[in-house]
């Protein structure tokens, strides 16, 4: 199995070759529900794929969440990411990790 890692006191990550599974408390401090504290994320092959995911999601009833698509710096480096809430309120995202500069 994949050994767990932690980040702070309330974030736990399980990393494997196929992706990451994380358990965290909601960042906004509100109660955890299906739509707060849970995010389903998809790996994208390109920035264009992330933008297409976001545009199609919004066009089909999704709502803007966490701002416009763009670059974000995180503990694992820079990513290009887009979040939205689907019509049921679930938070979903698509993320592309650009190659590291050499």
Model-predicted segments: where are they?
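A short acidic/small-residue loop/turn micro-motif
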Residues: 73-74, 97-101
């Amino acid at each position: 199995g994949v050994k767990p890692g932690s980040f702070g006191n309330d974030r736990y990550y399980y990393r494997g070759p196929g992706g990451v599974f994380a358990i965290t408390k909601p960042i906004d401090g509100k109660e955890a529900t299906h739509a707060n504290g849970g995010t389903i994320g998809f790996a994208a092959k390109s920035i264009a794929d992330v933008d297409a995911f976001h545009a199609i999601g919004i066009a089909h009833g999704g709502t803007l969440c966490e701002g416009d698509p763009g670059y974000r710096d995180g503990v694992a480096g820079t990513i290009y990411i887009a979040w939205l809430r689907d019509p049921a309120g679930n938070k979903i995202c698509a993320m592309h990790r650009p190659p590291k500069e050499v």
